[in-house]
Amino acid sequence: MRREIAIILILIAIAIACCGCIRKPQEGGIATTKIKIGVMPDEATLPYYVAAQEGIFTNHGLNVEIIPFQSAMERDSALIAGEIDGGGNDPVSVALMRNAGYDLKIVSLGLQATPDKMRFAILASPASNISSVADLNGKKIAISRNTIIDYITDTLVGDTAVELKKVEVKKMPLRLQMLLNNEIDAATLPEPLASYALYKGAKLVISDSMLNRTISQTVIVFRADFLNNNSEAVNEFLAAYGEAVKRINANPEKYRALLVEKTHIPPEIASNYTIATYLQPQVYPETDFDTVIHWLQAKNLLHRTISYEDTVWRGE
């Protein structure tokens, strides 16, 4: 009898101890949720780092781990493998992954070009005589095929008679090096590499900020399985992101050092580099989605229907 009582007491003690292991709610009653976010070393990631370092994620009941990647391929592989839950991405990549059968959702628009701040540019080599889009006709341009870079290149050239000789150079540092060494006529580069190339003598042919419409946008994505099970946490994530955006836009210089550190902006241009104006979380526009899908269809890169309704999450 005593032994039975002792066993019961032990079981009660274990049960009480386990109760202490249950996730405790933060202030406001929000349970702590772990989210793994994958990021690239580009300026679109700054709000994530600000929200993490200034405790904004924590205040929203989130435990966010930011995982850096050096290539989009590595980031996307981690996303579809379930090693990360979401993060920054681009609409071309998202559409191609959905086409391959991976259920990802765009939960918000991210960063985009503005009239005073480019995100992508076509640049000519320092020794070239290229000064306009028309001058690109028949010239070799370094890109990465079937990516946002390829999409931006085609869109910047537009409906002209210009025929480009596209050269596959996936690694952006190599693309930059070939451009500056005059080994290629032109290249399409993202920021901050585009600004650095200009600093080193490359010539600006055209950038996305020179157009009268927005063509280059980042998006925030999550795996559908994570989103379905953690919709409240994703809403809190976007709210925290929005708070970080407010702080950055209110005092961008305060975050210059963090931006330089996380995006590897070359020291030669770090002090004068234009900091982007960040957007509040918002639904990714259907018109922009359709433009990307039409481009992918024209290149025969889609073998299934990729609909706006299935791809874009409107919140709950």
Where do the language-model regions lie?
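Short, glycine-/small- and polar/acidic-enriched structural segments
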Residues: 29-161, 166-169, 185, 191, ...
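Pocket-lining segment of extracytoplasmic ligand-binding domains
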Residues: 92, 166-258
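Secondary-structure end/capping motifs
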Residues: 228-303
